[in-house]
Amino acid sequence: MAGQKIRIRLKAYDHEVIDSSARKIVDTVTRTGASVAGPVPLPTEKNVYCVIRSPHKYKDSREHFEMRTHKRLIDIIDPTPKTVDSLMRLDLPAGVDIEIKL
């Protein structure tokens, strides 16, 4: 697989979970002999939802909720077949969304 690059994008609501997952991926890749660029922190996406506190009236009294999506980017340069196999077997937490591009 010479000259190839694997790009991994991670998304999660909890920054501690995504950082530990990125650390696991980087450790696994370096152990198998491929080189790694990252993890690169991408901009955090922040969604704010505004809700009226009262069910009937008092429109001036509102409550704001926000949901933050943390993102990380990892590039694996010149992966070996052993690298790909170990990434397939890697167990990551349920709260992390993984997107892999070859």
UniProtKB/Swiss-Prot annotation:
List, in alphabetical order, the GO biological process terms annotated in this UniProt record.
translation
Tell me the InterPro entries matching this sequence.
Answer: Ribosomal_uS10, Ribosomal_uS10_CS, Ribosomal_uS10_dom, Ribosomal_uS10_dom_sf
Task: Kindly list the GO CC terms recorded for this protein.
Answer: ribonucleoprotein complex; ribosome
Domain of life, per UniProt, equals Bacteria
Q: Which PROSITE patterns match?
A: RIBOSOMAL_S10
Q: Which SMART domains match?
A: Ribosomal_S10
Asked if 4Fe-4S is a keyword of the record, the answer is: no
User: What's a single GO MF annotation on this record?
Assistant: structural constituent of ribosome
Q: Mind listing the UniProt keywords for this protein, alphabetically? A: Ribonucleoprotein, Ribosomal protein
Protein's UniProt keywords contain Iron-sulfur:
no
PANTHER family this protein is in? 30S RIBOSOMAL PROTEIN S10 FAMILY MEMBER (PTHR11700)
Say which family it is in: Belongs to the universal ribosomal protein uS10 family.
Task: Enumerate the NCBIfam families for this protein.
Answer: PRK00596.1 (NF001861), rpsJ_bact (TIGR01049)
Q: Tell me, how does this one assemble?
A: Part of the 30S ribosomal subunit.
**What does the record give as the function of this protein?**
Involved in the binding of tRNA to the ribosomes.
Name of protein: Small ribosomal subunit protein uS10
High-level lineage: Bacteria, Bacillati, Actinomycetota, Actinomycetes, Kineosporiales
Which gene is the coding source of this polypeptide chain?
rpsJ
